[in-house]
C-alpha cells in the first residue's frame, strides 16, 4: 500500500490537505521535519501516514495523557495498531504493552517525554527498530522545557542512545521564532 492507500484505507480521505503531502513525502524520504500548521489542519496525519509505511515503530512524544488516549482511540478505531504508555497504566500494563510492541503489534506508541528517561523504556527502545520519533505539540519544548517539564530538553539525549538515529519530526500550530529556534536546537532539525 502507498501513502494514498493508507490515507484512504485507514483515515477515509481521498487526498491530502494543503501542506500535508509535502511533509509526508519528506519523512518518507528520510528527512527530519518541523511541521507548522494551524489547529485542525491535520498535523497528525503527517506523521501517522508515514509511520504506517515505515518498517519500525514510531514513538510520538505527547504532552498530555488525554491527548494520547484520544489519538490512540481514534487510531485503533480506524484499524491502526497503536498504544500509549503513560502514568495512567499499571506497571503490569506497561510491561504487557512493551512486550506486544516488541512482537510487532504496534506501529505507533505515544509516550510522555519523561518516559524516554526511564531505564525500562530505554531498554525496550534499544531492542526494537524505532523508525521515527515525533514530537507532537512541539511548542512544549520551549514553553515547558526550561522549568515545568525539563524532559522535553532531553529528547535528543534519548535519540543518541539508540543504535540507529531515527527520523525526527515535530509538529505544532505555534510558529514563533522561539519555538522554531528551540526545536532546531533541541531536536537537531534542519533550518
Residue ranges of predicted features:
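SF2 helicase catalytic motif II
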Residues: 124-164
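Conserved helix-turn-beta segment of the N-terminal RecA-like "Helicase ATP-binding" lobe
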Residues: 69-90, 100
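Walker A/P-loop NTP-binding motif
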Residues: 28, 44-57
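Conserved helicase ATPase motor motifs in RecA-like P-loop NTPase domains
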Residues: 38-39, 139, 159-177
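Conserved helix/coil segment N-terminal to the catalytic DExD/H
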Residues: 91-132
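Conserved pre-motif I regulatory segment
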Residues: 1-36
Amino acid at each position: 500500500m502507498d501513502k494514498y492507500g493508507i490515507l484512504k484505507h485507514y483515515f477515509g480521505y481521498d487526498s491530502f490537505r494543503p501542506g500535508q503531502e509535502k511533509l509526508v513525502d519528506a519523512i518518507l524520504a528520510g528527512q527530519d521535519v518541523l511541521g507548522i500548521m494551524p489547529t485542525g489542519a491535520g498535523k497528525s496525519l503527517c506523521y501517522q501516514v508515514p509511520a504506517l509505511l515505515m518498517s519500525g515503530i514510531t514513538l510520538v512524544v505527547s504532552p498530555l495523557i488525554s491527548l494520547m488516549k484520544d489519538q490512540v482511540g481514534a487510531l485503533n478505531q480506524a484499524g491502526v495498531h497503536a498504544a500509549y504508555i503513560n502514568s495512567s497504566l499499571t506497571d503490569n500494563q506497561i510491561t504487557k504493552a512493551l512486550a506486544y510492541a516488541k512482537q510487532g503489534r504496534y506501529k505507533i506508541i505515544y509516550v510522555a517525554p519523561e518516559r524516554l528517561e526511564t531505564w525500562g523504556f530505554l531498554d525496550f527502545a534499544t531492542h526494537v527498530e524505532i523508525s521515527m520519533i515525533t514530537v507532537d505539540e512541539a511548542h512544549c519544548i520551549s514553553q515547558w522545557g526550561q522549568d515545568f517539564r525539563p524532559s522535553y530538553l532531553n529528547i535528543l539525549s534519548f535519540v543518541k542512545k539508540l543504535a540507529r538515529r531515527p527520523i525526527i519530526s515535530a509538529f505544532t500550530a505555534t510558529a514563533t521564532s522561539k519555538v522554531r529556534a528551540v526545536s532546531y536546537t533541541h531536536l537537531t532539525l534542519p533550518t
